[in-house]
Amino acid sequence: ALGGVLKALAKGLPSVISWINQK
């Protein structure tokens, strides 16, 4: 379960970074 959470986090990080850069 923890591995899946880490994978989802790693997958969502680029989106968060690009969202922050757009501000």
Curated annotation (Swiss-Prot):
* Keyword terms of this UniProt record: Amidation, Secreted
Keyword Transcription regulation belongs to the record: no
Short name of one Pfam family: Melittin
Taxonomic classification: Eukaryota, Metazoa, Chordata, Craniata, Vertebrata
Molecular function in Gene Ontology = protein kinase inhibitor activity
Q: Where in the cell is it found?
A: Secreted
This protein's species is Rana arvalis
Report what the protein is called: Melittin-related peptide AK-23-1
Main localization of the protein? secreted
Q: List the disulfide bonds.
A: none
Entry annotated with the keyword Cytoplasm: no
Tissue expression notes: Expressed by the skin glands.
For this record, the Gene Ontology CC terms, alphabetical, are:
extracellular region
Q: Where are the Lysine amide modifications?
A: K23
